[in-house]
Amino acid sequence: MKDLAPDIFRKRLLVEGYFTIEVNEQTLIDFFAYITSRLSLRTYGQPIVHATSGTGKDENQGYDAFVPLIDSGIYIAIWRQQKFLSLIIYTCKDFPEDQAVALTRSYFNIAVAEHSLF
């Protein structure tokens, strides 16, 4: 992918994996506090968590959650039935991606995760 704005620093990390803990709205709010504090990412608003609550296909039930960062934001999608998550950390600030992956794996008790910078 061609970098259309080389003068603007951007870092985008995608992490996906199957988790083994029970996830609810509070779990996601607590995760945002956990990961932002450990990566020194500053928020400027409260996390927003949406539950699909029976809309759409059964296999897609779960949560969509976002927290705004001073330097962009973090989004996570949760598929409750499959116990699968997809996390995107998008920042205009550098952060240690290996630590972000390790923190996510630890918090959600993920045995195998895949990740990619883009």
Predicted feature locations:
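Polybasic/polar functional segments that serve as interface/processing modules
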Residues: M1-F118
